[in-house]
UniProtKB/Swiss-Prot annotation:
Residue positions with a glycan: N63, N90, N97, N362, N531, N566, N705, N830
Name of the molecule in the record: Receptor-type adenylate cyclase ESAG 4
Membrane topology: Multi-pass membrane protein
InterPro entries: A/G_cyclase, Adenylyl/Guanylyl_Cyclase_3/4, Nucleotide_cyclase, Peripla_BP_I
Functional summary from the UniProt entry: Could act as a receptor for an unknown ligand.
Source organism of the structure: Trypanosoma brucei brucei
Topological domain ranges for the Extracellular compartment: 54-858
Length: 1235
């Protein structure tokens, strides 16, 4: 890529006077000769002469004149705008004295008559050129028709048009003679949609365009497509047929307009060509009260005509201009946008030019471009065109002839003008250049689009939130880059300083994560300040919801706001402490009041505290006191007193002289009083809630900094330390990377940042976004991981209340904070001070406080008896057993934490049993032994086996991955004592290749030496998934089983893998830490459809044995298994009776029924289970634990159907390469289809 920088107007170019600013060739030679020994000077001089003479001959011919034909005008463009765009172009070249690269002279030819069409001017001038190698460039033209009519002339004379301006997408095609500098109309269309939905947040967006004028048709189709994909639709479309600008019939026009206005669009994207029907539309809009104040959003190509039309419409309607109602996209900054370095340089150059060329421009003010925004914007575009042209002419070798010059323009070119970037440009590529990053057949120019709003008196201002940059790696605009937005509100309550300050900190914390215009998934999260008062907050929110898109509310809220339907509240910070109520649309990420009290009670018990006091100021003081008492009682701590304090009462009079006191419900004056009491009373410990602590953090930090009392102010949090620069927390590291101001390292800022990171994680997984979509994600995924923060379990299931559930809502859970630890204020101020407790995720379950009360004597007896029993256990050697099982119990009994499940299965096991009945018993026994050794090594839990399939649980995702990887390596290096298994696998592949011409055997045709390094013995496929499970204890086996979506997903993952392959879901992969992910080698497989799973699942392949290759995933094979259950280790509700049995299957069924007819159901059950396990026949769920006659009959039919299919295939394939065993001929293809 040629990176041509122009940070100074004369960089690499000749300054005034025409002399090079760098040392001349003669000076360099003299300096070099001076340092050489005398004996070497003559040979070196001769060598230099031989090198320089050819260059001097080239230089003698190097004075080149490049002619530029200025075609930047059109019939609908007022003369002042033509002057502006040409003045900017001239200013760039004049700053170089019309000379580039020291010897390239630029000569600009202007039309003598602007009544002439640009295409005619171009044609006439090119026909006058007799030397077809002389470089001629066209500056312009403007407008789609002029460009289209000019193309034949440009191509005939091999001349390139620079800086042309078009309005429609259809003309932005690959043509090496059209050199676009601006972003294309499709990009501007996407930005108009983005701004409407993400910044204006309009609920109803309309679209206006005319048919028959070759403008707006493609942009309308693009808008409909993009809106639909995002889950939106247009509210009102105005379009009439205006062929070549002729007006549509009046009656038809009015009828269409009435339908359009009835839809009440709040904003209208107007692709109105500069013709009468566009002016008529605006006239009617200006007088229609329904839409007169709707936003008008238009692309840059029609802004000049549209502004004039709208002003005339307002005058006719007697209406005043509304600043901000008219919005336009633009492809370059305004002339007054001095935040850009390039614009600062433009301002200097432009001022100098205007001072010196008053006669040519009729502009007397040197800063005219600062006070006339429309003309100034065009001057900037002209100046950029001149800068690009100067760089394009900067090498004499490129100017040898027209063909060479055209090729040079597409030699992977990019133009950097300070902080404005134009390009990449590329021509026709060879071979796989495009795959390696080359830009091919691209003439499209800038990727930046700006949004500007019209103010009064023709002034404009840039809207920073509208600035958008499309992917530079893509030549043409990709509409899939625009995704449905998450429009969030942060509530500023102007009558509460503390709440407003908290909202400001919250917004600042997420400011680094909201959309910045880098189109893609990182540009989907948007936050808007919502100003209100405490009293009116709920009503104002409902009004805003009726007028604007509101996906979610973040930060401080009032209790009344939480009752607003159809809005999701993400981690709301209530102004007053309240107990959590299950509202499905309210998602708590921070510890709830209940969770905090539970964790703090546990801490107090561990600290040896026997009783505590509480001072509570809240409308729910009684309920809070009851919950605090229950939490303390759970941990054998007593609540000695609970005082209910009125709002405004002095907290100091309620604080005890010593001991521990919960202070719930804080106000600003309370901070100093608590700090004073802590300083005075060395034995006093004060516990506060995290939400209130975060609201008042600055006050607490000021009052307790460098005091002993800081160690005795206590709270609970799930956050990493906001001020720890040596932290291992990924969240905190990322926060510090983007927020350099340490004054903003506060609890609220890092809380907001963590929440923003979570929103980004969610947005990666959903295309459409709405309040319902957002809240459903939490309850569907249950547990969500973002960096090092884990949230969940979220559960909206309504369960039956049980005695040990304190929550009145049964199982429903809308809170998800995990890993909550207890801190002191001293730690908050100094990260090197450790937390008071290790992190814990509270179970939130309580024992019955009235049950089990015993007397002191009984308690002594129990203690003595327990001690004797423990002695006997130790003596009998049971302790080691329980020690070894400790990990198992930890894994199996906690269903509030994600678990990683591993499913394994031997590839083609049925076929192997049929082919090698003498080998497989020992092979399967070895298979079981090796896997169980690994289960023990990695402290996992063997849930169950069915035949040769294992289901394994692990509390550590990394341990699960290590187990799967070592499993493959163990099987590879094990001495199986026979080659029969490998030979069979190769035969299976060869047979399949014969039957399927599209199939390529991955191992059958490998060189034996290569094969031995990659494959050996049984091939086991493995699937890994992480998530929450319903864990149940089997009272018969005394083991644990895992149910739910996680086990099904893990089984489905295994079922699509090939033998020797390890697949892991995105959830499993992302459950690994960043450090753990670096230790494994994976290949991303993209989204994989799984049977029974609504959406494709992102999948990764663990490269356990480097060099192994596999067939495509077994997706079609799984689909053929529709009569089986969702897991290989569970029952099924599908019945074989739902399909007709083949003749072979009927024979088998009849034989089994005859053999088992005299058995009791229990005996038949015992006899049939081995057949089911060996043939992988899932059991119907309806049979239960004890089979009746109908259940036995159903199982017989299932076994018969499975074996019958194998026999039928064997009959059709008598030449199978697999040996016959006991009358059943098995082929690898049947095995693959069945298993």
């Amino acid at each position: 890529m040629n990176m041509l920088h122009l940070s100074d107007r004369n960089a690499s170019l000749a300054p005034s006077g025409g002399e090079h600013s760098l040392p001349t060739g003669g000076a360099v030679c003299r300096d070099a000769m001076d340092i050489l020994p005398v004996i070497l000077r003559a040979p070196v001089a001769l060598l230099l002469l031989l090198v320089v003479l050819p260059q001097l001959s080239v230089g003698a011919e190097a004075n080149v004149t490049v002619k530029v034909l200025s075609a930047t005008w059109n019939w609908y463009m007022p003369r002042k705008y033509v002057t502006a765009i040409n003045a900017g172009f001239n200013a760039s070249l004049k700053s170089r004295n019309w000379t580039v690269a020291g010897s390239v002279n630029v000569q600009v030819v202007y039309p003598s008559n602007l009544d002439l069409m640009p295409e005619d001017f171009i044609k006439k001038q090119l026909e006058l050129e007799t030397d077809q190698n002389k470089i001629v460039i066209v500056y312009g033209p403007l407008g789609d028709k002029s460009v289209m009519h000019s193309i034949p002339h440009l191509m005939n004379h091999r001349v390139v048009a620079f800086g042309l301006i078009t309005g429609s997408t259809f003309i932005r095609q690959w043509n090496p003679y059209l050199y676009f500098l601006r972003a294309d109309p499709a990009a501007e269309t996407l930005v108009l949609i983005r701004y409407s939905l993400c910044q204006l947040r309009v609920l109803r967006l309309g679209f206006m365009y005319l048919q028959g004028v070759h403008y707006g048709d493609e942009e309308y189709a693009l808008t409909v497509n993009v809106m639909s994909r995002m889950g939106y639709e247009l509210h009102g479309v105005f379009t009439v047929m205006s062929p070549d600008g002729k007006p549509a019939p009046d009656a038809e026009f009015k009828e269409v307009f009435e339908r359009f206005a009835t839809a009440l669009p709040q904003a209208i994207i107007v692709f109105g060509a500069p013709v009468d029907d566009t002016a008529k539309f605006l006239m009617m809009m200006a007088v229609d009260e329904r839409i007169a104040r709707s936003y008008i959003l238009s692309p840059s190509s029609v802004q000049l005509s549209l502004i004039e039309m709208w002003q005339l419409a307002l005058e006719a309607a007697g209406a005043s201009f509304a600043p901000g109602q008219l919005l336009f996209t633009g492809t370059n900054p305004l002339a007054k946008d001095s935040q850009y370095t390039a614009i600062k340089r433009f301002q200097e150059v432009m001022s100098e030019y205007l001072k010196a060329h008053v006669g040519e421009t009729n502009i007397t003010e040197a800063d005219y471009f600062l006070t006339h925004d429309l003309e100034g914007e065009l001057m900037v575009y002209g100046w950029i065109s001149g800068e690009v042209l100067s760089q394009a002419l900067s090498n004499l070798e490129w100017l040898k002839d027209r063909a060479t010059f055209v090729r040079s323009l597409y030699d992977q070119r990019r133009y950097v003008i300070n902080d404005i970037v134009i390009g990449d440009y590329g021509g026709t590529c060879e071979g796989d250049a495009a795959k390696h990053g080359a830009t091919c057949e691209c003439n499209q120019g800038s990727k930046a689009v700006y949004v500007k709003e019209m103010l009064e008196n023709g002034q404009k201002t840039s809207v920073r939130s509208g600035f958008t940059v499309l992917k530079a790696s893509l030549c043409y605009t990709d509409s899939s880059e625009l995704h449905g937005p998450l429009d969030g509100l942060v509530v500023f309550m102007k009558d509460d300083d503390i709440a407003s300050k908290a909202a400001a900190l919250w917004q600042k914390g997420t400011s680094h994560l909201v959309g910045k215009g880098d189109l893609g998934y990182s540009d989907r999260f948007f936050l808007h300040a919502f100003n209100t008062t405490i009293a009116e907050a709920a009503n104002d929110l409902r009004r805003d919801q009726g007028e604007r898109i509101v996906t979610a509310v973040f930060g401080p809220v009032t209790e009344a706001m939480l009752d607003t339907p159809n809005i999701t509240f993400i981690d709301p910070l209530e102004l007053k402490p309240r107990l959590n109520k299950f509202r499905r649309n309210v998602i708590h990420l921070s510890p709830t009041l209940e969770q905090q009290l539970y964790v703090l009670s546990s801490y107090l018990a561990g600290a040896g505290v026997g009783n505590v006091d509480a001072v509570i100021c809240s409308n729910e003081a009684d309920g809070i006191a009851d919950f605090l008492r229950s939490s303390l009682t759970e941990f054998a701590v007593s609540l000695r007193s609970a005082v209910i304090r009125e709002d405004g009462e002095d907290v100091g009079k309620y604080l005890p002289m010593s001991g521990t006191v919960f202070v719930i419900g804080l106000s600003v004056p309370d901070v100093k009083e608590i700090a004073r009491k802590l300083e005075e009373r060395n034995d006093l410990r004060v516990i506060v809630l995290f939400g209130e602590f975060s609201f008042l953090y600055d006050l607490f930090a000021t009052a307790l900094n460098n005091t002993a009392g800081a160690a005795r102010l206590v709270f609970a949090t799930s956050l990493p330390h906001w001020g720890d620069t040596e932290t291992s927390s990924k969240t905190a590291q990322l926060f510090h990377d983007v927020e350099k101001d340490s004054r903003l390292w506060t609890p609220l800022s890092v809380l907001a940042f963590a929440t923003g990171r979570l929103m980004r994680v969610i947005l990666l997984h959903v295309e459409e976004m709405s309040p319902e979509t957002l809240v459903n994600f939490f309850y569907t995924d249950s547990s969500i991981v973002s960096d090092d923060m884990r949230y969940g379990v979220f559960d909206d299931t309504k369960c039956v209340d049980t005695a040990n559930k304190l929550s009145k809502n049964g199982c429903a859970s809308n809170y998800g904070a995990t890993q909550i630890s207890v801190w002191s204020m001293a730690r908050a101020l100094n990260a090197s001070i450790p937390p008071l407790t290790n992190p814990m995720t509270p179970s939130m379950t309580f024992r019955n406080s009235n049950a089990g009360r015993i007397s002191g004597a009984s308690l002594v007896g129990i203690i003595i008896g327990g001690a004797l029993a423990l002695f006997l256990v130790v003596a009998l050697g049971v302790v080691p057993y329980f020690f070894l099982r400790n990990t198992v119990i930890t894994i199996c009994t906690k269903d509030d934490r994600p678990v990683t499940l591993i499913f394994t299965d031997i590839e083609s096991s049925t076929a192997l049993w049929a082919a090698h009945p003498e080998v497989m018993p020992d092979a399967v026994a070895t298979h079981h032994r090796l896997i169980r050794t690994l289960i023990s090594k990695y402290e996992c839990y063997e849930v169950k086996t069915v035949g040769d399939s294992f289901m394994i649980a692990s509390k550590s995702p990394f341990a699960a991955v290590q187990l799967a990887q070592e499993l493959q390596l163990c099987f590879l290096h094990h001495d199986w004592g026979t080659n029969a298994i490998d030979e069979s696998y190769q035969q299976f592949e060869q047979q399949r290749a014969e039957d399927d011409s599209d199939y390529t055997p991955p191992t059958a045709r490998l060189d034996p030496k290569v094969y031995s390094r990659l494959w050996n013995g049984l091939r086991v496929r493995v699937g890994i998934h992480t998530g929450l499970c319903d864990i149940r204890r089997d009272e018969v086996t005394k083991g644990y089983d895992y149910y739910g979506r996680t086990s099904n997903m893990a089984a489905r993952t295994e079922s699509v893998a090939n033998g020797g392959q390890v697949l892991m879901t995105h959830a499993a992969y992302m459950s690994l830490s960043a450090e753990e992910r670096q230790q494994i080698d994976v290949t991303a497989l993209g989204d994989v459809p799984l049977r029974g799973v609504p959406k494709p699942v992102e999948m990764y392949r663990l490269n356990a044995v480097p060099g192994r290759t596999f067939s495509v995933l077994r997706l079609e094979l799984e689909l053929l298994n529709d009569d089986e259950d969702q897991t290989t280790t569970s029952c099924s509700d599908h019945s074989s009776s739902r399909t007709d049995l083949s003749v072979a299957a009927q024979t088998i069924a009849a034989s089994l029924q005859s053999l088992l007819g005299t058995f009791t159901p229990a005996q038949r059950q015992k006899a049939l289970i081995p057949f089911c396990e060996r043939w992988r026949v899932p059991l119907p769920q309806k049979v239960g634990n004890v089979w009746d006659d109908d259940g036995c009959q159903e199982v017989v039919r299932r076994v018969a159907a499975k074996v019958g299919r194998v026999m039928d295939f064997g009959t059709r394939k008598p030449s199978s390469s697999v040996t016959s065993w006991k009358g059943v001929e098995v082929s690898s293809q049947v095995e693959e289809r069945l298993l």
